[in-house]
A protein has these predicted regions:
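Juxtamembrane intracellular "pre-TM" segments in multi-pass secondary transporters
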Residues: 2-15, 196-225
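Intracellular juxtamembrane helix-capping segments at the cytosolic ends
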Residues: 39, 121-135, 322-335
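Helix-to-loop junctions at the C-terminal end of transmembrane segments
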Residues: 67-80, 269-282, 366
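A membrane-interface helix-boundary motif in multi-pass transporters
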Residues: 81-82, 164-183, 364-382
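C-terminal ends and interior cores of transmembrane alpha-helices
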Residues: 89-104, 292-304
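Cytoplasmic helix-loop-helix junction between adjacent transmembrane helices
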Residues: 111-149
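C-terminal membrane-cytosol helix-exit motif in multi-pass small-molecule transporters
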Residues: 162-163, 182-202, 388-393
């Protein structure tokens, strides 16, 4: 009876935290949505060499990768709530620097701003793990899915902020959009201040197994590779798409709307992704997400109309949702409670490091190789990730007693 009450109370806290983090994700998730919508376009205006147009977006991803380990160390010392409050302040500062770069037409300053915004993103990306920290095993996948659902609102808030503010500063187009981004980060402070996370002392009591031992687990390897392929390819194609659309004669508005539909597709399925995982398993959902990513590339290779771009971007978003949430859920099975901080940080460093590399390479590739080349590059990594996850699924079903 007492055990039942404990589990019930634990999931009550987990649900409360998941809802708070969903709101924080809605505000913090607008941070990359705004930079992805505008980064390449502003980069084209400010960079002397158009090959570097996507560098601001790439630096956003690099900032996320660079920030995950310091963010984890900070949260280990201050707790989740303290770390997230500092992260939101960093986000507001980065947006202000980016706006200053636009106003002064200083490409380097603008890039610095997007990098700092990436540091904020490293905190935001850990919201999904924070939601799982207090959840029972039965509720973990759904808690992660709830938080990712906040990105659905971010997919509206970010692009709509651009539409509402882009013309407020005619002498410095889009500067007001980045100031709005900073205001959203400040609003996130009010939300994350309500978070009740486990005491840091509970994490410090036992450091668990060495990180190398954990990372050598075949399941961890398959999970991380699936996550970095799902996220890396999404960033790779998404960063190239607006540039390719404009190069094909489509309008900036059509490109921005394509990104909005893409972001909505990224987070919209979170209404039911947790239930899909309960029904079909973590590996099954991850495999479905990777297959949708490959299908997006097939559509991208089929034509250059607005419809082709939009459908490809929607499929890409759906694939990211299923693939990344499924892979994240798999990662949570690879560590003990006392190991979570270091394993989550290692996972995110690997994932967002690959995303940064993908984003850096996409600008030059779409400029010199074209949109078709970008899409052909999708298939090899998807095949590798599919093989690894499918093998793990086969192993689990073949030896259920060992699980």
């Amino acid at each position: 009876m007492n055990q039942h009450v404990s589990i019930h109370e634990g999931d009550r806290l987990a649900k409360r935290n998941a809802l708070i983090l969903t709101g924080a994700q809605a505000l913090g998730g607008a941070n990359p949505a705004i930079i992805v919508s505008l980064g390449g376009l502003v980069g084209t205006q400010l960079a002397s060499d158009k090959t570097f147009a996507t560098v601001p977006v790439s630096l956003l991803q690099l900032g996320i990768a660079a920030g995950v380990i310091p963010a984890a160390m900070l949260m280990r010392r201050l707790g989740r709530r303290g770390g997230y409050l500092i992260g939101a302040l960093v986000g507001a500062s980065g947006a202000s620097v980016a706006a200053a770069g636009v106003v002064t037409r200083d490409f380097a300053l603008f890039c610095l701003g997007t990098f700092i915004c990436g540091l904020y993103g490293s905190f935001v990306q850990s919201y999904r793990f924070a939601a799982a920290d207090t959840a029972s095993p039965a509720f973990k996948a759904r808690a992660i899915s709830w938080v990712m659902l906040g990105g659905l609102a971010a997919g509206v808030i970010g692009p709509q902020s651009v539409f509402w503010t882009r013309d407020l500063t005619p002498s410095a187009p889009f500067a007001a959009s980045f100031l709005a981004q900073g205001a959203l980060a400040l609003l996130a402070i009010l939300v994350v201040s309500q978070l009740h996370a486990p005491p840091v002392a509970a994490v410090k009591a036992d450091r668990g197994r060495p990180l190398g031992e954990i990372m050598r687990q075949p399941k961890f390897v398959a999970s991380v590779i699936a996550a970095l392929v799902a996220y890396g390819l999404m960033s790779f194609v998404m960063t190239s798409a607006p540039i390719a659309m404009v190069a094909c004669g489509h309008s900036v508005g059509e490109a921005a709307l394509g990104i909005q539909w893409h972001v909505l597709a990224m987070y919209g399925p979170s209404f039911f992704t947790g239930r899909l995982i309960e029904r079909f398993g973590k590996e099954g959902v991850t495999i479905a997400g990777l297959a949708l990513t490959a299908l997006a590339a097939v559509v991208g290779l089929s034509g250059l109309s607005v419809a082709h771009f939009w459908i490809a971007l929607v499929l890409l978003g759906l694939g990211w949702n299923l693939g990344f949430i499924g892979a994240t859920s798999l990662v949570t099975d690879c560590y003990r409670p006392e190991e979570r901080v270091k394993v989550q940080a290692a996972n995110d460093f690997l994932v967002f490091g690959s995303v940064a590399i993908a984003s850096f390479s996409s600008g030059g590739l779409v400029s010199h190789g074209g949109w078709d080349t970008v899409n052909w590059m999708v298939f090899p990594p998807v095949a590798i990730a599919l093989g690894l996850v499918a093998w793990q699924r086969f192993q689990r079903k073949a030896a259920p007693a060992a699980v």
